[in-house]
């Protein structure tokens, strides 16, 4: 890095003489997809810096509509106009109301109370329902909901809703399908999003979303509450595992890939979304993922520049780039303003800058929470008014009729005009039209799609995703893969070594995760997977003991048993981490690993036997660095899902070559919290992460050579330095070679470093990634094209800004310099 910078400094005078500046002119810049946009160059008072400003409408220009789009929109608008002209105030408010399924079921049952449902349908015309009857726990002795029960339930609700509606308006049902259709029995469960991100392979995000949509739509539910697009920079936060990690670019690319997978590459604004696709929900818009306290739904203090630099891009890519049909609003507050009351962000930014045309739904009880939780409203009426003024469309009430009753009174009193209802109702009806609910509201229990739930090829896709996610962080003396010629006895221990429940984490069968492994009809634990692929014979013997159970007092007897078995083992594999959790119940006060798990690990390391540490965890729990470095190997498994056990076993035995990379910074101490890899230059050396973002080893070695810019102008006499014109796209190529003896996949990461800017730049930012699969001694040239937006930052005026200057492009150990004028 220092060499490149020095060459830049030496060549600046020559470059400035060679390249002229223009001021106040209109120029064209390269943007997403190779398109161009016209921007106005802002003059500078002095010096030779050039500065350009971009808007999201230029970065993501609206697509050209074809005749099919035009016909669809015309037919939809005519239909919705006619329907709305016949709707009463009560019907319109009903469309804006969403209730939980448990408002329709009796305690400890999943049976729909049809009398209650008919009352809601005929009196309040409720337009949406959500959730699983067993989300919060067992309903009597019922653990899960299978496809036939779901289909019967949805058909019952839909039939009674349509019968009760004067205009035969169908309801829309939504479900948290977070890592697969996790509330549908037998559905395939994938790694949670941090694991997906660790693959650095957008194909896995697309495939996971496609299968999730298919399995959700198969039971009659066309609305999926996913993906989470928050940036995972607060490791204390209970929902960090639902994010795609700490990097805005990874979250943007993986999130957009998921949106396209969920919706079949379509959006609901200019065309239909047909089965097996569902409409998805970009959530939680936005700033939710970095609560200052680390506790769920608590206050976030994020300056406007940081919001726009790090937290908004993933939503822009998903909404404006990929066409997400709905958004769910951040339950918390940002800079003292609950997002549900923010006209700036829900209307000016979301509807204005991001051009969002879809439905904005609240999260759980969030309008009511403006009164008793946020204290911005002194009454339910004031809370509803604040939320409507801000721009919500649908209220996830979800447990009573307060919203429709009070809103009807407010409209009757003239406090809320009917025209405000019409804005939201039109969006909701447009969505229902796009999903085909008016023409085909009832799911078919005999449809072929129902039989595909949990099919073998889906579970194989989940296993393949887990294989590419698992990240080898440490491998002393190449202890992995385990050599069966020299290793005959293995001890497998730890609380997550034989637990499918722990592999899945939260949002699995129930909101807080499964109670027991028997709730999963498919899947393998690590122990089962290891025994299956090794046959567990006398030639390779696997011993198992739990060692310790998470959440119970220290049981030295269990630890002693593990230590005793370790004495007769050649290698010890210990699997530690966390129990399933989600949202507020998952709040913690200390990021440190459970001390009893640390004690188990310490005593196993003290035996002197090689210890392979496997981490199965929702958050990067802090471990004593010296203890971790004493382990022979470290594998990060994240929450790999039901199918995760066998991929982990295959990596241990060398049947699969690990290729995951960390999508977040793994802290070594509490002082590392809140400092991501893209920190400022002034923060260099202030943290000591246990492992860095992008870390990940392989059983082979990859070499990078010949990094070059194919359409830049080389600087004469300055090898590796180039010049270019601000606002253009540039293509960089690098050759990747497998120098080892085994086939392997490699995630090739391209970073951009802005050396000087009007706003202090980050040391580096990821601007491209690709996955390659190479046989030994084979090479492949990788190409990355960076458009103008990817050289931008958020300027002193909080606008997207391009500025002439010096940049470093980095891929592995390769670097080049680029001066843009």
From Swiss-Prot:
One of its GO terms (molecular function) is beta-glucosidase activity. Glycans are attached at residues 113, 146, 266, 535, 555, 703, 721. It comes from Dictyostelium discoideum. Its EC number is 3.2.1.21. It is an enzyme of class 3 (hydrolase). Gene3D superfamilies: Glycoside hydrolase family 3 C-terminal domain, Glycoside hydrolase, family 3, N-terminal domain, Immunoglobulins. Residues 1-24 form the signal peptide. This is Lysosomal beta glucosidase. It comes from the Eukaryota. It catalyses: Hydrolysis of terminal, non-reducing beta-D-glucosyl residues with release of beta-D-glucose. PANTHER family: LYSOSOMAL BETA GLUCOSIDASE, PERIPLASMIC BETA-GLUCOSIDASE-RELATED.
């Amino acid at each position: 890095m220092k060499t490149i910078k020095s060459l830049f400094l030496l060549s600046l005078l020559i470059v400035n003489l060679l390249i002229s500046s223009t001021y106040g002119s209109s120029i064209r810049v390269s943007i997403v997809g190779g398109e161009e946009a016209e921007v106005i160059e802002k003059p500078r008072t002095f010096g030779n810096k050039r500065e350009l400003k971009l808007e999201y409408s230029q970065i993501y220009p609206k697509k050209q509509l074809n005749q099919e789009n035009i016909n669809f929109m015309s037919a939809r608008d005519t239909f919705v106009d006619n329907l709305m002209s016949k709707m009463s105030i009560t019907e319109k408010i009903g469309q804006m109301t969403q209730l939980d399924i448990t408002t329709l079921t009796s305690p400890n049952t999943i049976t729909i109370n049809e009398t209650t449902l008919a009352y809601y349908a005929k009196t309040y015309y409720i337009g949406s329902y959500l959730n699983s009857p067993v989300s919060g726990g067992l309903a009597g002795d019922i653990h899960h909901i299978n496809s036939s029960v779901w289909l019967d339930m949805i058909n019952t609700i839909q039939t009674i809703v349509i019968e009760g509606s004067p205009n035969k308006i169908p309801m829309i049902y939504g479900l948290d399908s977070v890592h697969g259709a996790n509330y549908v029995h037998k559905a395939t469960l994938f790694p949670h999003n941090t694991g997906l991100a660790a693959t650095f392979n957008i194909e896995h995000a697309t495939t996971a979303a496609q299968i999730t949509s298919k399995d959700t739509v198969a039971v009659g539910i066309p609305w999926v509450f996913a993906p989470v697009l928050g940036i995972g920079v607060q490791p204390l936060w209970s929902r960090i595992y639902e994010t795609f990690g700490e990097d805005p670019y990874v979250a943007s690319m993986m999130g957009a890939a998921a949106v396209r997978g969920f919706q079949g590459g379509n959006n609901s604004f200019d065309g239909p979304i047909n089965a097996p696709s569902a409409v998805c929900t970009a959530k939680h818009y936005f700033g939710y993922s970095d609560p200052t306290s680390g506790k769920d739904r608590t206050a976030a203090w994020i300056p406007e520049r940081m919001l726009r630099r790090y937290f908004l891009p993933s939503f822009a890519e998903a909404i404006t780039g990929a066409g997400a049909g709905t958004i769910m609003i951040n339950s918390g507050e940002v800079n003292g303003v609950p997002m549900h009351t923010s006209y700036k962000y829900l209307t000016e930014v979301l509807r204005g800058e991001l051009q969002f045309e879809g439905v904005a739904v609240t999260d759980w009880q969030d309008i009511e929470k403006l009164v008793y939780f946020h204290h911005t409203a002194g009454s339910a009426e004031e809370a509803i008014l604040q939320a409507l003024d801000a721009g919500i469309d649908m209220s996830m009430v979800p447990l009573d009729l307060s919203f429709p009753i009070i809103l009807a009174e407010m409209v009757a009193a003239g406090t809320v005009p009917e025209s405000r209802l019409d804005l939201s109702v039109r969006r909701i009806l447009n969505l229902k039209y796009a999903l085909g609910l008016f023409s085909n509201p009832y799911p078919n229990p005999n449809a072929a799609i129902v039989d595909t739930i949990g099919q073998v090829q889906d579970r194989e896709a989940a296993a393949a995703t887990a294989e590419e996610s698992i990240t080898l962080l440490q491998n002393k003396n190449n202890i992995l893969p385990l050599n069966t010629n020299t290793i005959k006895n293995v001890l497998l221990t730890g609380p997550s070594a034989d637990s499918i429940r722990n592999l899945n984490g939260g949002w699995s069968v129930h909101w807080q995760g499964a109670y027991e492994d028997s709730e999963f009809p498919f899947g393998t634990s690590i122990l089962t997977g290891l025994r299956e692929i090794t046959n567990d014979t006398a030639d390779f013997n696997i011993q198992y003991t739990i060692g310790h159970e998470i959440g119970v007092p220290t049981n030295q007897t269990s630890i002693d048993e593990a230590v005793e078995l370790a004495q007769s083992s050649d290698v010890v594999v210990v699997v530690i981490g966390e129990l399933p959790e989600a949202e507020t119940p998952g709040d913690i006060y200390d990021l440190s690993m459970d001390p009893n798990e640390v004690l188990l690990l310490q005593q196993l390391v003290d035996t002197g036997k090689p210890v392979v540490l496997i981490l199965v965890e929702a958050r990067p729990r802090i471990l004593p660095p010296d203890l971790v470095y004493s382990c022979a190997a470290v594998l990060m498994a994240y929450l790999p899902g039901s199918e995760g056990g066998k991929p982990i076993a295959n990596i241990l035995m060398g049947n699969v070559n690990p290729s995951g990379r960390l999508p977040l910074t793994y802290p070594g101490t509490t002082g590392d919290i809140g400092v991501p890899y893209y920190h400022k230059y002034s923060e260099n050396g202030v943290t000591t992460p246990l492992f860095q973002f992008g870390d990940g080893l392989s059983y082979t070695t990859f070499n990078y050579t010949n990094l070059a810019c194919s359409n830049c102008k080389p600087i004469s006499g300055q090898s590796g330095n180039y010049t270019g014109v601000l606002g253009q796209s540039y293509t960089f190529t690098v050759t990747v070679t497998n120098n080892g003896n085994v086939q392997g996949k490699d995630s090739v990461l391209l970073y951009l470093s802005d050396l000087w800017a009007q706003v202090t730049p980050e040391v580096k930012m990821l601007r491209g990634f690709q996955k390659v699969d190479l046989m030994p001694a084979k090479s492949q040239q990788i190409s990355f094209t960076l458009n103008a937006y990817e050289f931008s930052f958020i300027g002193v005026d909080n606008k997207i800004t391009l500025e002439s200057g010096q940049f470093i492009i980095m891929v592995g150990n390769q670097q080049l310099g680029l001066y843009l004028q």
